[in-house]
Amino acid sequence: AELPGKGDGAMVVSVRSLGLSGISGYEVTVECFLSGGLPAFDVVGLPDTAVREARERVRAAVKTCGARFPVSRITVNLAPANQRKEGTVYDLPILLGLLTASEELPPLPEDAAFLGELSLTGALRPVAGVLPMALCADRCGIRKLYVPARNAAEATLADGITVYPVENVAQLLAHLRGETPIPPAERWQPTGETLPMPDFSEVMGQENVKRVLEIAAAGG
C-alpha cells in the first residue's frame, strides 16, 4: 500500500487486490481517498451492483470489529478504471484502505494483496475464481496473499506466494498491527480423489459466450 501523505486534511491510500476477467486474473489497485466536506461514500472505476453495495458491508464490518468508521468524504477508485469490476472480492481491500487512511492501521505491506467478501459481522466469505487470481499475483510480484479461510487451499496451488487464511476482520487487524500473527496456509496436496471440474459460475461476465457453449454442449 502507498501512503502519499496528507494535504489539507486529505489522505490517499492504495491497496493491492486482484480481479477476474473471464478465466484470467488481473491486478486491481483500490485507491481510497478521504477528504473534508459532507460525509459521503462513493465507489468509482466501473463497479457493478455488487461492488457498489460493498459500501454498506464495509461500513457494518468496520463498526462490528470495534474500529472507527471515518467521518469524511470517501472516494474509492478501482483501477484500472476502464475495466469493469464485478463481484464482492473488493470488500476487504476497501475496508483496509479506509482504516489505513484514517490511521486505524499502520501502512500495509507493499508486496501484499487482499481479497474477500465481508459479512455484516466482519466474517470473511469465500469468493469465486481465487486460483486464477492467485496465479496472477505471482506474475505481478505479489508475495503475500490474504484470502478468506475457505479459499486458502485453492490459493496455495499457485507458486511464489505465501497465502494467509483469514476468518474475520478482527483477526486480520490484529495480524496487521503485529499483535497476533496469522499462520500461513500449508500448500494443499491433492490426495488423488476426483477433483471438481471448472464451473461456469467461476467465470465473471461473458454471459453470451457461456450461453453459446451451453447450447453447443447440449447439441443444439
Predicted regions and their residues:
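Peripheral, non-AAA+ core regions of ATP-driven protein-machinery
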Residues: 2-220
